[in-house]
């Protein structure tokens, strides 16, 4: 018998070489540890809620800022920087207010395949 359908994941994989990724290094250089923390928070919410994207509304902005004890404006600056560097897709963010990206989609498909094969 298969699992009950669920959109998000309880956990997700993280690459061990992520700290060598030039996009992550640029984010950390520009926004220090706060930038990386916000990026990881958003990734967590993406994988937890929908699995491969999140509609980042004012409520999500507030939640993120409140969690990290930051101003919403600063969180938004960091997210916009993440889109500029390609960590999130800039076009989808600007047009729809959705945060996702190529690596997020690839990881999502990989995790779905793992779940599918573990159910077989």
Residues of each region from the PLM?
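Winged-helix/helix-turn-helix nucleic-acid-interaction surface
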Residues: 1-13, 61-62, 68-120
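Short recognition helix of helix-turn-helix/winged-helix DNA-binding domains
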Residues: 4-50
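Short, low-complexity, polar/charged sequence segments that are solvent-exposed and flexible
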Residues: 30-35, 57-61, 109-110
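Alpha-helix N-cap/helix-initiation sites
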Residues: 32-36, 53-54, 72-76
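Short acidic, hydrophobic short linear motifs in intrinsically disordered regions
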Residues: 51-66
